[in-house]
Design a protein with these regions (language model features):
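Catalytic cores of nucleic-acid endonucleases
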Residues: 131, 155-168
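Accessory nucleic acid-recognition modules appended to NTPase machines
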Residues: 1-148, 155
Length: 168
């Protein structure tokens, strides 16, 4: 049927959802999702034979993107002025869903704040990408018509180390 995805492994789908929810705002590759789930023993249900294929993981992630459960943001090389194919980031449509799935926790509130900022930029009509200049990263490049904004998100600027990292 049109619009329906063939999900043949609901356990894998749930683990991918939990992985992406736990890693919002972090650089993630499709291969790293499957590898992490296997290496951390998260798919040991007695039935699985080996790691899930990258094709299956990609299909399940695509289903989550098409359902608007998660949004993917691409990396943009600011110097080369081109989108990169590697290591995008994923954001969950509603932080409340993340709290439901993972429980409330404060250990990575910086990524939760980044998630909120991402969706606010979308709400305001910006095209949003992650910026990359050499090894440094700009959290968001927000573009609308002729306007371009570079945005760094941090929970606190109190620490000198954080100030140096975020401002360089």
């Amino acid at each position: 049927r049109r619009g329906q995805k063939q999900i043949t492994d609901p356990t894998l789908l749930r683990k991918i959802i939990l992985f992406l929810a736990d890693n919002i705002g972090s650089s993630v590759s499709i291969s790293s999702i499957g590898n992490t789930l296997i290496n951390e023993g998260l798919l040991d249900d007695g039935k699985r034979k080996g790691a899930p294929s990258a094709h299956t993981v990609q299909a399940y992630v695509n289903a989550l993107l098409e359902s608007y459960f998660f949004y993917e943001i691409k990396r943009f090389d600011i110097k080369g002025k081109a989108y990169l194919r590697t290591l995008g980031k994923y954001y969950i449509v509603d932080i409340g869903l993340r709290n439901y799935l993972l429980g409330f926790r404060n250990r990575d509130s910086g990524h939760a704040i980044e998630n909120v900022v991402y969706f606010e930029l979308l709400r305001r009509g910006y095209d949003v990408a992650i910026g990359k200049i050499g090894s440094a990263e700009v959290d968001f490049i927000a573009t609308k018509a002729d306007a371009k904004k570079y945005i760094q998100v941090t929970e606190s600027m109190m620490s000198e180390d954080v100030r140096n990292r975020e401002l360089t």
